[in-house]
Amino acid sequence: MKRIVVIVLMMAACLGNAQAQLHLKANVQNNHLWRGMEVADGCLILTDLGYTFANGHMTLGLWGGTNTQGSYKEFNHYITLRTGGLEFSAMDTYNFSPGATYNNRQYFNYSAHETGRFLNCTLNYRFQQPRFPLLLSWSTIMFGRDRSADNKEQKYTTFVYAEYPIYNKEGWKVDAGVGGAFALNKAGEKQNFYGNTSGIVHTQLKVSHDLKIGSYTLPVHAMGLWNPQSQKAYFQIGAQIVNL
């Protein structure tokens, strides 16, 4: 892990002058939904601080979230590489909630058998044809709390996802998506990181709109999410309050 950090910092130093840019974004929403799960509820603030360089091809960033009750906290590190419609990202995720059954009290613990973290690697491709802007995504948990029941093997749970904008007119956009999960290494078990068995765990319909308030633009969204495997459904509404 230390070697990876050193390599990334060296790349940043070498490429940092090539059209480098800082950005800060923050959203307020009523819950945090991710891949068929409600990670946290209540009023949340989610933030993204990033440094983009190498002519826009690379971003290093910090992603964080908390709810107003203080029962949920998340602080992640990530790196993103992109070219054309292809994008690769790796996010080192660490989150805390009172009911967690994993180790969420040792931030710097990277022991495979003990850590509460997980490293999620994602490869996205967005078709560049204006008439067919389909998004395809493959994500695998490469390290961390995605283990077999006896804690001897990494399961490499994978989430595959497809999304398509079914409406995009007059400032309104509607995206429909569906995702399924399975373990590359089942380790003799049916369960994976996202559910009790392989299958569809995420279907969504998201409506986005840029709300004009005088000279200010407030991006807002509403989303319905259904998980047929867990028999659960969630509704989310949110707004982007910072975009620098």
Positions of predicted regions on the chain:
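Transmembrane beta-strand segments that form the barrel wall of outer-membrane beta-barrel proteins
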Residues: 26-32, 57-68, 88-95, 103-107, ...
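Outer-membrane beta-barrel "beta-signal"
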Residues: 205, 231-244
